[in-house]
Amino acid sequence: MTLKPSKRRKGRSRHSRKKQITSAILTEEGIMIKAKPSSPYTYANRMADKRSRSSIDNISRTSFQSNISRTSFQSNSDNNSIFETASLISCVTCLSDTDTIDRSETSTTDTSKDDLSANPKLHYPSVNGQLPANTVIPYGRILDARYIEKEPLHYYDANSSPSSPLSSSMSNISEKCDLDELESSQKKERKGNSLSRGSNSSSSLLTSRSPFTKLVEVIFARPRRHDVVPKRVSLYIDYKPHSSSHLKEEDDLVEEILKRSYKNTRRNKSIFVIINPFGGKGKAKKLFMTKAKPLLLASRCSIEVVYTKYPGHAIEIAREMDIDKYDTIACASGDGIPHEVINGLYQRPDHVKAFNNIAITEIPCGSGNAMSVSCHWTNNPSYSTLCLIKSIETRIDLMCCSQPSYAREHPKLSFLSQTYGLIAETDINTEFIRWMGPARFELGVAFNIIQKKKYPCEIYVKYAAKSKNELKNHYLEHKNKGSLEFQHITMNKDNEDCDNYNYENEYETENEDEDEDADADDEDSHLISRDLADSSADQIKEEDFKIKYPLDEGIPSDWERLDPNISNNLGIFYTGKMPYVAADTKFFPAALPSDGTMDMVITDARTSLTRMAPILLGLDKGSHVLQPEVLHSKILAYKIIPKLGNGLFSVDGEKFPLEPLQVEIMPRLCKTLLRNGRYVDTDFDSM
């Protein structure tokens, strides 16, 4: 009894595998699906479809238009009328949502290595049904492309009926020809079909196509619910290659697609992945395996995965790894693992080579994920991975921390922030409720504010921009040059590709500030204009690691002491280099990647609760720095001397001892991956 339905399902499955190969062309924005010529077959289907849908036609159209970013299309031919409606406003979100990603990649071993060069035939779900005419697959989403040597048996030409084999005569029909011309053409086609059926061969028909039409399989990242997943689609792409002495004609099309898809970024990255299985809610491994790994393999990145087993393990891993085998370290974690990796590389005898060769980035799988939100503009693991694949290698400033207990042995590097007072205690003392995720920060801050606890100390500062007006001028001056000042890459407005594509405008994100308008990205076109010739200027040297203000030499004379009336009643002391310190906390809206300064924010513990309310409510927008009770400055270095007997510092979310802390900026020391070559736009210039 149970076998019969199973056989019927299998039979239907085999029949449903017959799919269409669609024609496409290359455009400046991506690969665009060509408008398909009408035929008696499609015309009859359209008429039948209209009759069956006449009673709900208006409803279906309204529903589609109001839910375009989340609409899922079925794979049968009854949707042709909807595709006609959508043709002018279609995008990659219109593709079928019925397939699931391949779960076979979810390895359970502690370490694994995946190299696509050894397994070039990875299988990804294909797109069900036709792609609407005028759909554009942006270069920013294309992961890989390759030629298909032979036409798959389960495909047929989208321009002909499913019962007829491929024929070049149909592909050459004008898109504007009328029904009579189509009928005449099909008569000729049927004659050709009878001959081909007699010889049982379709290869002769394929060879009659234009020599500039190639059958290509494209793997791209398609939105699925709140993520992106790799999908493949076979396309007949019309492309006439330019004359080239170093490219063969048959290689030119795929090479051109990949060049446009990976402009200004490294192809086939060699990635060393460090996963903290205990980070966040303990789901880092699952998030990486299901959300990130399929995209990395689809883009032909070679990856090696290791897992941390205890606090500080990533320091040892980075200190002992073979840096010649990799160009990127991806931390599938929160912000703690990038901190350990940076310091592990710093402790290497060949740290100069390590920081020159390797880019450090984050796949958000922890509680904070500030690095991903600031650099990739997203807290979503799959979108962050797509940005990792497509982003520009950029140098950012680091901060060097010195305390008496470890300064002589080895100073510590910080990429994110240092904090003392209310925020520090909240960050560290809520570790026991890590299972709550980011909500633990909000709960801890609210509890500490109600207590109005003071953290007396002495603070000495070397300012770069002391007042808020000076800071604003500094920000406006460096926003358009500081962040990409040292990038030797080439881009112009006529050939911008994925780097100006909004990866997240097709799904609702938890962080609304991640969504960027296309106009904002257009402003970056004139920023990325450096010459590739002098790449050695971007290399750091040993002297770049030299500390300008050693801890044992005392406080320099040009440093200013903060008013004791403020420092003795300190509520929050926070310095940082990235705009976000958590997915929903824009604490340093004026932070820039490489402006040579860090931001300092200070509050007074005596501030009333009624005045603290707008400060806290403005953290998600970054408007808290505009409040008169908040001190906001750009600084080059500082020293803070606590007066309490117990407490702690938090550096990049890690606990540091309560003893004098001295920090200075170290310009452009670390190489990371920034979307569009800059931090996420905080709109600080319009505040």
UniProtKB/Swiss-Prot annotation:
Assigned keywords, A-Z: ATP-binding, Golgi apparatus, Kinase, Lipid metabolism, Lipoprotein, Membrane, Nucleotide-binding, Palmitate, Sphingolipid metabolism, Transferase
Chain intervals with Basic and acidic residues compositional bias: 101-116
Biased composition (Low complexity): 193-207
Record region (Disordered): 1-20, 101-130, 180-207, 506-525
Example GO BP: sphingosine biosynthetic process
Superkingdom in the source lineage: Eukaryota
Occurrences of domain DAGKc (ranges): 266-405
Sequence ranges of Acidic residues compositional bias: 506-524
GO molecular function: ATP binding; D-erythro-sphingosine kinase activity
Keyword Transmembrane: no
Active site: 335 (proton donor/acceptor)
Binding locations of substrate: 333-336
Catalytic activity: (4R)-hydroxysphinganine + ATP = (4R)-hydroxysphinganine 1-phosphate + ADP + H(+); a sphingoid base + ATP = a sphingoid 1-phosphate + ADP + H(+); sphinganine + ATP = sphinganine 1-phosphate + ADP + H(+)
Subcellular location: Golgi apparatus membrane
InterPro entries, sorted: ATP-NAD_kinase_N, Diacylglycerol_kinase_cat_dom, Lipid_Phosphate_FormReg, NAD/diacylglycerol_kinase_sf
Lipid attachment, kind S-palmitoyl cysteine: 91, 94
Keyword Lipoprotein: yes
Positions that bind ATP: 276-278, 308, 340, 366-368, 434, 440, 652-654
UniProt topology in membrane: Peripheral membrane protein
Function: Catalyzes the phosphorylation of the sphingoid long chain bases dihydrosphingosine (DHS or sphinganine) and phytosphingosine (PHS) to form dihydrosphingosine 1-phosphate (DHS-1P) and phytosphingosine 1-phosphate (PHS-1P) respectively. Redundant to LCB4, is only responsible for few percent of the total activity. Involved in the biosynthesis of sphingolipids and ceramides. Involved in heat-induced transient cell cycle arrest. Accumulation of phosphorylated sphingoid long chain bases (LCBPs) stimulates calcium influx and activates calcineurin signaling. Involved in heat-stress resistance.
Additional record remark: Present with 1760 molecules/cell in log phase SD medium.
Name recorded for this polypeptide: Sphingoid long chain base kinase 5
UniProt source species: Saccharomyces cerevisiae (strain ATCC 204508 / S288c)
Taxonomic classification: Eukaryota, Fungi, Dikarya, Ascomycota, Saccharomycotina
